[in-house]
């Protein structure tokens, strides 16, 4: 692989070779992120910027590569997980190194937005000129503002017939206090106005501060795993110079490493001889475990300790689910696949789990339901895993008289109706939700929130005009209510116009209980749920009907029950298959026929008493889907 000397300013891969341009002096840089609501055009704008600077080959209009979305699941779902690219642009006869530290747009990955912004001095706030300011536009704006970043407001998709740039610019002024004259109007798809974006990055965003002769101080903001080189850390050099062969130490773990490779992403990995103050790049240092690359850690030269920079709080799993192989003999392979995948996604928590119905598996913790779905799809795409995922749950807090316990597995939830359990109260996690919706759908959205146990509702008008007025609805919602079908119902009731964002708001006391499902009087542990009492009867009836549809008929009658403690709240009966035991009788007395029927009845009674119902794996697929 070609290596940059420390003063290379451009690296372009052409069809017939590699071209390098060098400068004999230090190259000024700008570190920035693109922040926006999901689907407002972050990846497309990044493609245009990379094309304009010659970092990637220019494509025809509309044929962008979505360079930031490297995973198959990211391209299919239109989401960006995490990325980092360097490019070089000339402004007023001078070359600049521009480091794009991209951020995900979905609410599940808000934690990754925070860590990306920590390595930047500026942010491009992208707003769709047809959709306007959305819920996550507001949250990412405040996140960037709190960190003191210079914000460049941009209206994207001005080429759309439905675009209303003047109205949306006024909306941004009212919501963010932004001067409309500072807003850039672009179309990332066609490239219109994107050159002005590059100029604004250089002229408006301040350069990173840092002294080249100061002791080394580098900020670790991300990492990924390479099967040959181990953990690759993405860093922002704050002060000093980092070179290949340097010995470094971690402020967090106190472990020491030697730099075996370092460089920039342009857009793929390009090794360099050094990283200077303000530059963003990658390092390989024979780090074996992802847990060693502590996000927010400060790296310094071994033997030259420095004051550590402010780090981050650890990620907190918000949604838990059991993952089991369809074939129990595949568990070792599944466990190895999960462990490998978590090397590239450190926010997933793992714990072994055993189920009498599904066998051996793992209980995984995720940042949200989209994160869970992305992880599942990556398991299937990259490791060809055939898995069953149980219904998602959230971490509940069980308060006893002498202690508190966090429980994320329904099978471990105590029977609150049992006085001997000594449970003082149950608390559930809640979130502060923000919903932006056109006025005509406001009533439906209020009803949706109330049906999902929303509290402390308030609202305000964001804007008004000839076309429509939009309302921001704020409320406190139980996390368990939004990990199921809340988002789908939100989009359905608003015809797709509502946007949704939330943040953790701690725990609140709640009236919850464990619902068990019994087949022939025996509980199925993999189907246990934790349900609020207001929804127990409806959920119980819904699930027993689902079970009734998918369980194969037996030779004896099978009662299907939903129970809270010892109280049965819903029941369906699966009728027995009838075998004609009198078919072989060609005559004789009536009592002979009755004797055969009585023997059959007695046999079925014994089978019902002794028999167990084995749910086929196909039945679990149907039951654990969201289909009713």
Curated annotation (Swiss-Prot):
Keyword rRNA-binding belongs to the record: no
Gene Ontology biological-process entries: positive regulation of translation; translation
Domain tr-type G: 27-209
EC number: 3.6.5.-
A single MF term (Gene Ontology): GTP binding
Residues that hold GTP according to the record: 36-43, 102-106, 156-159
Localization per record: Mitochondrion inner membrane
Keyword Nucleotide-binding appears in the UniProt entry: yes
UniProt cross-references to CDD domains, sorted A to Z: EF4_II, EF4_III, LepA, lepA_C
Lineage top rank: taxon: Eukaryota
Class of enzymatic activity (EC top level): hydrolase
Gene Ontology CC terms, in alphabetical order: mitochondrial inner membrane; mitochondrial matrix
Note: This protein may be expected to contain an N-terminal transit peptide but none has been predicted.
Similarity comment: Belongs to the TRAFAC class translation factor GTPase superfamily. Classic translation factor GTPase family. LepA subfamily.
NCBIfam families: lepA, small_GTP
HAMAP family in the record: LepA
Function comment: Promotes mitochondrial protein synthesis. May act as a fidelity factor of the translation reaction, by catalyzing a one-codon backward translocation of tRNAs on improperly translocated ribosomes. Binds to mitochondrial ribosomes in a GTP-dependent manner.
Name under which the protein is recorded: Translation factor GUF1, mitochondrial
Higher taxonomy: Eukaryota, Fungi, Dikarya, Basidiomycota, Agaricomycotina
């Amino acid at each position: 692989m070609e290596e940059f000397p420390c003063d290379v300013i451009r690296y372009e891969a052409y069809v017939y070779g590699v071209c390098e341009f060098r400068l004999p002096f230090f190259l000024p840089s700008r570190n920035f992120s693109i922040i926006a609501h999901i689907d407002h055009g972050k990846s497309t704008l990044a493609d245009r910027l990379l094309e304009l600077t010659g970092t990637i080959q220019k494509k025809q209009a509309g044929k962008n590569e979505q360079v930031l979305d490297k995973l198959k699941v990211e391209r299919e779902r239109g989401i960006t997980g995490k990325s980092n690219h360097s490019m070089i642009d000339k402004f007023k006869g001078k070359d600049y190194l521009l480091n794009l530290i991209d951020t995900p747009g979905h609410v599940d990955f808000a934690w990754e937005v925070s860590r990306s912004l920590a390595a930047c001095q500026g942010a491009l706030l992208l707003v769709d000129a047809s959709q306007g300011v959305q819920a996550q536009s507001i949250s990412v704006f405040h996140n960037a503002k709190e960190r003191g970043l210079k914000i460049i407001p941009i209206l994207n998709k001005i080429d759309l017939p439905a675009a209303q740039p003047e109205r949306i610019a006024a909306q941004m002024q009212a919501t963010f206090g932004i001067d409309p004259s500072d807003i850039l109007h672009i179309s990332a798809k066609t490239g219109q106005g994107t050159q002005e974006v590059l100029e604004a990055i250089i002229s408006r965003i301040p350069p990173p501060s840092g002294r080249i002769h100061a002791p080394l101080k580098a900020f670790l903001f991300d990492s990924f795993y390479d099967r040959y080189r181990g953990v690759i850390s993405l860093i922002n050099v704050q002060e000093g110079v980092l070179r290949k062969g340097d010995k470094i130490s971690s402020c967090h773990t106190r472990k020491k490493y030697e730099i075996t490779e370092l460089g920039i992403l342009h857009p793929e990995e390009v090794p360099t001889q050094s990283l200077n103050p303000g530059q963003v790049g990658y390092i390989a240092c024979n780090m074996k475990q992802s847990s060693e690359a502590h996000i927010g850690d400060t790296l310094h030269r071994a033997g030259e300790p420095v004051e550590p920079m402010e780090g981050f709080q650890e990620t907190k799993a918000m949604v838990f689910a059991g993952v089991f192989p369809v074939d129990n003999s595949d568990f070792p392979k599944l466990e190895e696949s999960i462990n490998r995948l978590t090397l590239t996604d450190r926010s997933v928590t793992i714990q072994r789990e055993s189920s009498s119905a599904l066998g051996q598996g793992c209980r995984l913790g995720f940042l949200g339901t989209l994160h869970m779905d992305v992880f599942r799809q990556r398991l299937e795409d990259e490791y060809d895993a055939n898995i069953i995922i149980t219904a998602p749950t959230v971490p509940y807090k069980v308060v006893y008289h002498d202690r508190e316990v966090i429980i994320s597995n329904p099978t471990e939830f105590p029977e609150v109706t049992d006085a001997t359990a000594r449970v003082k109260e149950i608390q559930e996690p809640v979130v502060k939700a923000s919903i932006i919706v056109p006025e005509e759908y406001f009533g439906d959205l209020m009803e949706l929130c109330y049906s999902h146990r929303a509290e402390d509702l308030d609202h305000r008008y964001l804007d008004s005009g000839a076309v429509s007025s939009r309302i921001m609805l704020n409320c406190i919602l139980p996390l368990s209510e939004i990990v199921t079908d809340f988002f789908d119902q939100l989009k359905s009731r608003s015809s797709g116009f509502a946007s949704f964002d939330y943040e953790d708001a701690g725990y609140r006391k709640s009236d919850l209980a464990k619902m068990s499902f019994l087949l022939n009087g025996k509980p199925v542990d993999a189907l246990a749920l934790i349900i609020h009492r207001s929804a127990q009867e409806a959920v119980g009836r819904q699930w027993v009907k689902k079970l009734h549809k998918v369980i194969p008929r037996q030779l004896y009658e099978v009662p299907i029950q939903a129970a809270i403690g010892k109280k049965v709240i819903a029941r369906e009966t699966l009728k027995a298959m009838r075998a004609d035991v009198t078919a072989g009788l060609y005559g004789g007395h009536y009592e002979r026929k009755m004797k055969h029927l009585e023997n059959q009845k007695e046999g079925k009674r014994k089978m019902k008493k002794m028999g167990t119902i084995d749910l086929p794996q196909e039945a679990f697929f149907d039951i654990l889907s969201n289909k009713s």
